Amino acid sequence: MDMVSLKFIGVGCMAIGMLGAALGVSNIFSSLLNSIARNPSATEQLQRMALIGAGLAEAMGLFSFVIAMLLIFS
């Protein structure tokens, strides 16, 4: 296998990181909706914590995307 093929295999593996971020964000907001349904008085605090968690999970996906782009164009 040449280096170009290995590079694209590596980029394909980096897609797993973006998949993990998407699953993490969906899990966060699913839990948020369940929590708000159980305790509507805690909505403001739960939303704040969910947005922080979603931002951190999404940052991992963006880091994975940046590394994939670096692999493609290097």
Curated annotation (Swiss-Prot):
The chain crosses the membrane at residues 8-28, 52-72. Its main location: membrane. Disulfide bonds: none annotated. InterPro entries: ATP_synth_F0_csu, ATP_synth_F0_csu_DDCD_BS, ATP_synth_F0_csu_sf, ATPase_proteolipid_c-like_dom, F/V-ATP_Csub_sf. The record marks 58 as: Reversibly protonated during proton transport. It is found in: Cell inner membrane. GO terms for molecular function: lipid binding; proton-transporting ATP synthase activity, rotational mechanism. Keywords: ATP synthesis, Cell inner membrane, Cell membrane, CF(0), Hydrogen ion transport, Ion transport, Lipid-binding, Membrane, Transmembrane, Transmembrane helix, Transport. GO terms for cellular component: plasma membrane; proton-transporting ATP synthase complex; proton-transporting two-sector ATPase complex, proton-transporting domain. It comes from the Bacteria. It is a multi-pass membrane protein. PROSITE patterns: ATPASE_C. F-type ATPases have 2 components, F(1) - the catalytic core - and F(0) - the membrane proton channel. F(1) has five subunits: alpha(3), beta(3), gamma(1), delta(1), epsilon(1). F(0) has three main subunits: a(1), b(2) and c(10-14). The alpha and beta chains form an alternating ring which encloses part of the gamma chain. F(1) is attached to F(0) by a central stalk formed by the gamma and epsilon chains, while a peripheral stalk is formed by the delta and b chains. NCBIfam families: PRK07558.1. HAMAP family: ATP_synth_c_bact. Belongs to the ATPase C chain family. F(1)F(0) ATP synthase produces ATP from ADP in the presence of a proton or sodium gradient. F-type ATPases consist of two structural domains, F(1) containing the extramembraneous catalytic core and F(0) containing the membrane proton channel, linked together by a central stalk and a peripheral stalk. During catalysis, ATP synthesis in the catalytic domain of F(1) is coupled via a rotary mechanism of the central stalk subunits to proton translocation. This is ATP synthase subunit c. It comes from Rickettsia bellii (strain OSU 85-389). The gene is atpE.
